[in-house]
Design a protein with these regions (language model features):
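Charged, low-complexity intrinsically disordered regions
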Residues: 1-11
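Walker A/P-loop
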Residues: 48-68
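Conserved pre-motif I regulatory segment
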Residues: 10-54
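SF2 helicase catalytic motif II
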Residues: 129-132
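Residue-level preference for the first positions of well-ordered beta-strands
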Residues: 50-54, 79-81, 113-115
């Protein structure tokens, strides 16, 4: 019985495997203001399709994430929902302006602009079908 449970679990895990295949697209915009390492990370995340940009404090996660989000919006023709902790929502929108990315803060589920910034606690207000 224990072997059967282990085999069932292994089959379950195999079904969840995504493999290393890319499911994204070729980047449409990689601005010159990104450092080489940032450009490489954003390029990888866009091509991968299902990836996460993880970087230490001060390495530019916000501009990298905003460029990623802008690429998704440009590719899909829909806004991208960009989630942040509540403490940095406004800062993210301000940085978007600095980095020439159209971003707006929304608390109520309205989707407007290229990138819609909100916090985790407000996610239930948003319809995923409105976003790329």
């Amino acid at each position: 019985m224990a072997d059967e449970s282990v085999n069932d679990y292994l089959r379950f895990l195999e079904e969840k495997t995504q493999g290393g295949a890319n499911s994204g697209f070729e980047p449409l915009w990689l601005p010159d203001y990104l450092f080489d390492f940032q450009r490489h990370m954003v390029d990888w995340a866009i091509r991968k399709g299902r990836g996460e940009i993880m970087a230490d404090c001060g390495l530019g996660k916000t501009p990298m994430g905003l460029v990623w989000a802008s690429n998704v919006a440009r590719k899909t023709g829909k806004p991208t929902l960009y989630l942040t902790p509540v403490a940095v929502c406004i800062q993210t929108v301000e940085e978007a302006e600095k980095f020439h990315v159209e971003a707006r803060y929304s608390r109520d589920g309205s989707s407007f602009g290229h990138v819609v910034v909100t916090n985790y606690e407000k996610l239930h207000h948003f319809n995923p079908h409105d976003f790329g």
